[in-house]
Amino acid sequence: MKISGILLFSLLLVLESTAQNKKQRVIADNKKQYIFSDTAGITASYIAYHGDRFPLTDLITIDSLSISQASLKGKTVFINCWFVACQPCIAEIPVLNELEKKYRSDSTVFIALTFDKADRIRSFLAKKPFHFQIASLPQADIDSMKKISFYPFSAILNRQGQISFVLVSWPGGKDSDTQLLTLLDQQFKKALAQ
């Protein structure tokens, strides 16, 4: 068990360093924009398209708060899919917290979906705060919502509940936080205006 854990951790480190050395690629089609790490190895055909509804179900957060479909109507929603052992996921949390702080209001909702168990999430949050409303779901449920299994994954939904932006596997690297914040800020402003 220990050896397989060490091997998995080593593989994740290699994959992470490879991802950070690659540039991002943008797939654009009729004002639809999807950004992927070059290492993601996916095309836009795997992603729910711009204008589609994100199939979010009613949720219960790890703090026992209810997030219903009805409560999201008319709100701009940021959804992030992550997990505790995902280093790229963890690396982007400070940027996501900054975005949440800037746009926190009654007309916005920031949701983080993870397949980690509530106890593990709480232990993680004690060391590294994440200011989104966090819900734990089975991994298969999360992957079926976002239609791919890559992490981290973020989607911005406009007030009509339609996907206005998708980001998969941010590549990291020098000035990465600033670039990511600028990109997400621009895309969130667009969604607020829709």
Each model region followed by its residue ranges:
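Short pre-active-site segment immediately N-terminal to redox-active cysteine/selenocysteine motifs
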Residues: 75-77, 81-85, 117, 150
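A short beta-strand-turn-helix
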Residues: 51, 56-77
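Thiol-/selenol-based redox modules, centered on thioredoxin-like
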Residues: 156-194
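Short, internal strand/loop/helix patches
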Residues: 111, 125-160, 165-168
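Acidic helix N-cap motif at the loop->helix transition within catalytic regions
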Residues: 120-122
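N-terminal targeting signals for export/organelle localization
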Residues: 1-56
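Conserved redox-active cysteine motifs that mediate thiol-disulfide chemistry
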Residues: 81-98
